[in-house]
Amino acid sequence: MVISKLATNCSRISNAQWYKTVMMCRPKYFDVCHHLLNAHMEMKIPVKKGLAAKQWENAYNTLHANNVKVELLEPQQGLPDMVFTANAGIVHGNIAVVSSFGAVPRQPETQHHIHFFKDRGFEVIIPSDHNVQIEGCGDFMPTHDGENYFVAYGFRSAFKAYAFIKDALSLPKDRLHHMKLMDPHFYHIDTALMSLTRGHLMYYPGAFDKESEKKILDIGSHKVIPIDRQDAMDFACNSVNFIDNDEHILVGNKFSNDLKRKLNDFGYKVIETPYEQFLLAGGSIRCSVLDIGKSDLYENE
């Protein structure tokens, strides 16, 4: 792995170009069969596979109807979690940092992710240190303006991932913020924090330690939207947000009436598309979508 040649490739994506092109994977082999990879996977309720397929297609069609281009990753038998493509890696400009899974059942996914990115012309970076577990955009969250980046650890990504991502993407240290997750129900940062296209940070306070929450409050300033545990458990933060025809659109599983009113008041169009079959595995719509906007969509600094 060569990191040094990335030093001149630091770029940021404008909020108007989030989720223009995404990676998804149909849930052909989706199931909950690995006990407690996260706190949601209790395996007490069986997955209704036909309903799961329908819910995925509804989410896919909703994105497509709002001019989001979808590139499909081929599902593989024996890899039931491939549907959660946000964990495949981190795409920054023309660079794809491929995930290094600590969870053994997901490790075979990596070779398929590498092929996907290489076939589309990305420069692929893979952690050479197997102790650097990184689970892609599950634990990497940029702010809407590309000025700040949150990197989480505590459950699925390693503490060391922070330094690796900083070097791999040539990100300034003062713009990359280390976040500690505390609640096992919010094992990835994208289950508890969401950066929105109008500059807001929506988050669940109970997911973070006090120091990490302070970073959210400092960066978000007057544009912070705290949510309660019920909205958090409905994966409100695990939604997809983009701009289409000047509308700031938020596509997610479920939002309380109070949260919907707040988001509407802030100028967001909320679209609910039920996704509860995937919540049984601890993921919602954002977990199923990876933003892969290529370098020609990016603004050089």
Residues covered by each model-derived region:
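The feature marks the mature, well-folded catalytic cores of soluble enzymes
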Residues: 2-301
